[in-house]
């Protein structure tokens, strides 16, 4: 197994998975400051492959709204928004999300992800994505997971 489910959740986490070097967690609103810091620090790095956001997106108050939506969508089984936290430092270094979750006969979803610029090419996203995909197959019983990747994004193409 590439992950274990941690029942000793902290900081208002709704779900937490541990891998060898990472913690993947659905974070609550009290983490808005740390999430905002991650997004601000990586704004220009993510710009080429991310959707466009205005300046208000990169504020703590706006992130609290997004986190509230994430948590509600997670509770309803519509979204699994896993923030990637480096266990050694406690830093938020990325995110893997599963969305467009279809149940019934379909049992599929899509995934998207991003990583902190300083943590690229170190195997963190490979570790996170392998564990998160295994979790979705095991716990959500997905049959298929599609990755939304722009053809110009060579790193993501190599990852999947």
Regions found by a protein language model. Give the residues of each.
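Short alpha-helix boundary/capping motifs
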Residues: 62-64, 74, 139
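Generic, well-ordered alpha-helical segments
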Residues: 27, 38, 55-62, 76
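Conserved GNAT-fold acetyl-CoA-binding loop/helix
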Residues: 47-68
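Acyl-donor (CoA/ACP) binding surface of acyl/acetyltransferases
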Residues: 1-34, 38-48, 81-160
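A short helix-loop-beta-strand connector motif used in the catalytic cores of GNAT acetyltransferases and
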Residues: 55-56, 68-83
């Amino acid at each position: 197994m590439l992950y274990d489910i941690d029942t000793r959740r902290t900081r208002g986490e709704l779900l937490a998975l541990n891998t060898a070097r990472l913690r993947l967690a659905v974070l609550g609103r009290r983490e808005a400051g740390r999430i905002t810091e991650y997004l601000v620090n990586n704004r220009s790095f993510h710009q080429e492959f991310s959707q466009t956001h205005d300046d208000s997106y990169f504020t703590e108050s706006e992130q609290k709204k997004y986190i509230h939506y994430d948590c509600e969508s997670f509770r309803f089984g519509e979204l699994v928004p896993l923030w990637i936290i480096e266990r050694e430092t406690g830093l938020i270094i990325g995110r893997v999300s599963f969305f467009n979750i279809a149940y019934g006969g379909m049992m599929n979803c899509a995934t998207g992800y991003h990583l902190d610029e300083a943590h690229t090419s170190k195997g963190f996203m490979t570790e996170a994505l392998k564990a998160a995909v295994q979790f979705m197959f095991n716990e959500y019983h997905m049959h298929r997971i599609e990755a939304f990747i722009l053809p110009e994004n060579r790193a993501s193409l190599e990852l999947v």
